[in-house]
Each structure stands twice: as C-alpha cells, then as structure tokens.
Swiss-Prot record:
GO terms under biological process: cobalamin biosynthetic process
Protein name: Probable cobalamin biosynthesis protein CobD
Main function: Converts cobyric acid to cobinamide by the addition of aminopropanol on the F carboxylic group.
Family of the protein in this entry: Belongs to the CobD/CbiB family.
Places the protein is found: Cell membrane
Keywords: Cell membrane, Cobalamin biosynthesis, Membrane, Transmembrane, Transmembrane helix
Amino acid sequence: MIIILIGAIAIDIIFGEPKEYIHPVVFSGKVSKRIETYFRHHDNRIVYGSIFAVAVIVITAIPYFLAIYVSSFVLVIYVIVSMVILKTTFSISAMGDHIRLVVESLKNGNISDARVYLSRVVRRDTSNLNENEISSAAIETIAEGLVDGYMTPLFFFIFLGIPGAFVARIINTLDSMCGYKDRENFEFGRFSAFMDTVINYIPARLSWFFIGFSADVLNYRHKVISPRKYVSRFDSVNAGWPISTMACALNLRLEKRGSYIVNDEGYQPSVRDIERSMHVFYVAVYSYTIIFVLPLLVAMAFLL
C-alpha cells in the first residue's frame, strides 16, 4: 500500500492529471449525464436523487475495480494499475496548474482573464469580482481543495484501500454536480451533499492542524488559529475549517460577497497571498502524508 501511494504521488508530480478518457471524474460526469434525466423525472426527488447517486458510484467504479482485479494476477501490473487508479482519486499538481493561470493573469493586470480562469474552479459568479475578491476566492479554493482533493481520499485509502479513496472522489464529484441548494438540486442532490459532508467531516477538522503546522514551517503564521469563531458563518459544516484556518494563519480577510466574511480584521488578500496559500497547500500535502497517512498505513499493515 505504501509503495502504491508513493508511486501515485510520483505520477501526479511527474505527469499531472491523466487523460480525460481514463479519468473517473470525467467518466462519472458522462455516466451522470446519461442517466440523470430518467431519475429527475419522478416526484420523490430525494429518493430518486439518492438512487441516482448510488448508481453513478457503482457504474463508474465497475471498469476501474475490474481493471484492478484483472491485473492482480501479475504483481507488477497490479502495482502499476493501482498507482494510476489511486492517482486519479487525488490532485496535487492540478491545483497549482489552475491557480497559476489566475495568478499570472492578475500579475499581468488582466482581470477579465483572471475571472474566467477562476470560474473553472469555483461555484460562485466571478463576472464582477474585483482583484481582492478574486484573490479571496482563489485562496478559499486552495484551502477547500486541500481537504476535498487530497486529505479525504487518502483518509479513506488508509482504512478502505483504493476502493475507499475512489468512492470518496466520486462522492465529491457528485456533490460538485448536484449538491446545490437551488430549486433544481435542493432535494435531488441532498443525498450527494450529505455523503460529501460525512466523508469530509474528519479530514476538514484535521486540516486545522496541517494548515497551521505548514504556515509555521513557512514562517507565515500570524496568530493563534481559532477557526471555531468563524465556521458557523458557512453553510457547509466542513468548508469553514480549512478556509478559516488559512485566513487566520495568513491574517487575511476572506469574503464571499453576500455570504460570509472570515477574519474581519485581516488584510485584504492579494496575488502574493494566493502564492503563499499555494506554498501552505504543498507543505500541508506532504506533512499530512508523512505525519498522518504513512504511519497509519504502517500500523494497518501490522494489524491486518
């Protein structure tokens, strides 16, 4: 398991995201589009939305789990296939790739391009955001992405192996597709949103330590971090933890217009702060892996 994890991280660093035609996030999106219409055309939207979510997970998982099973007859092939599939469950370099485009646009004074690039990684409307608001949204995305895109999949990898990490990734994708509180998705996407809340609950709270620790390592941390003061301002019971911790660690005033303000007395975020947040992200990724994931994988190996 440790070799598979290290290999998966190496694949991410060297090659980045796999091609779309083998990526489970893309495949789950295609599955969703194929079957969604059928499940939405029913009165009991909560029940059928739940069945839809389970169906997407099962259908998406079949070819990947089958690939693992078939490859298991040859150890070397099994390890390589497992590395590739585990890699698809988390993202390290992809976050940097997306955020880099926003940073470069802001540095060049091209706020219109920055809004477009930001819109690819956030749910909010970016069309009228100013530079501070773009910076805030990017930093919030980095903080949340640490949990959704890395900590949670590997948390489940520790205890449930590749299937656990894989399902966690698809649940996160389902939440991003239909876990909204608008009229169309409030009932239909409720189960997807609930599953996403459950799987991220512990990793989100662990992020308090790893973001704070990483800010200390980088000599960024401004003050004692107390995210509890702000987490109640978020609709999500999980998102407030990494975002508030990042805001306090870097002493930034992060704001989603009309929704919440975190660390009210902090500085307005800038392009430089986006870069600092990415530094925290990378250190948090590797410290989480070394301090938390690897020791528990070793412990699980001895217990099982």
